Amino acid sequence: FKCIILIMDINSDNNSGKKFNFDSFSNLDFYRNVNSQLLDLADIDKSKKIVDLGCGNGGITEMILSKVSDVSKVVIYAVDSSSTMISLALKRFGDRKDVFINYIQSEAQNLHENLKEKVDTVVYCNSIHYVPEKESVLRQIGDGLSEGGVLAFNTSFFDGAHPKETELFLRKWMMKSLRVLRNEYNIKPVKSKVQSRIQLTPENYEDIVVKSGFSVKKKTIKNIKVPLDGWYEISSFKDWIEGVLPGVPLDIGKKVLQDTVTNLFKELNISTLDRKWLSIVASKS
């Protein structure tokens, strides 16, 4: 087992970060399947040096290792801005003696400063929607790729991600949540537009990819049946709470969103609610 840990100019997470992180959601089977499909789309088994950008608890890294034919010939750079997530990833692979993983704590926009080696593939799962300067970050990613290197990313935050038949459910969910906030907590969200809610169309994403020096090789938009667990667990995630209920204290937002979505699933007698995922695989031009 070989491991290099690089901690880069990011403050350690506090306890609230641990309480409201992405960990519980990222372990759900449906979500793992979404990311597994992206790795297959990217032909990940052909790469030897791979960046898992926004690695979280190491779930994607683990999936990458399961898809390559010889892990001893693969180097993975597991990158995340959160020290909590880096710690979870470290723990996940603590017993693996056969893999070479470099852990780098860094924001996506600072990766070029913290990783100087050229790589074959950058995998960027469900995070690109948080980045304000997408073109700048993608250009930096391209600069870090070998000639013909691959960028693979996905997101469920884009214009058109909600199928029309789900709009009534989502409106009801928000109405119920706002009612509970008003009646039980005397709180209402503040008007705010966080980055993940400034949504681009799939065509916008393609244009940005091309302008950043890539050629789009594959693009898919898939309808995913998200179970109640998915909506329940995403409602414990800080960025989701701040996105749908900006200004509401996280602990209150979490409880309200989880209670109302659970009740609404029961009320409507449904087991899943659809959401679309956009996946793009591009090569360095």
Name each region found by the language model.
Residues S16-G17, K217-S271:
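C-terminal helical/coil "lid" or tail adjacent to the Rossmann-like core of SAM-dependent
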Residues N21-Q37:
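Conserved SAM-binding loop and adjacent beta-strand
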Residues V51-L53, N57-N110:
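Class I SAM-dependent methyltransferase SAM/SAH-binding core
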Residues E113-V122:
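A short acidic, Gly/Pro-enriched loop at the edge of an enzyme's catalytic core
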Residues T121-K134, F157:
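A short SAM/SAH-binding and catalytic strip from SAM-dependent methyltransferases
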Residues E135-E147:
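A short glycine-rich, Lys/Arg-flanked "PGG" loop and its adjoining helix->strand segment in the class I
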Residues A152-R182:
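Conserved class I S-adenosyl-L-methionine
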Residues R197-S212:
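Short alpha-helix
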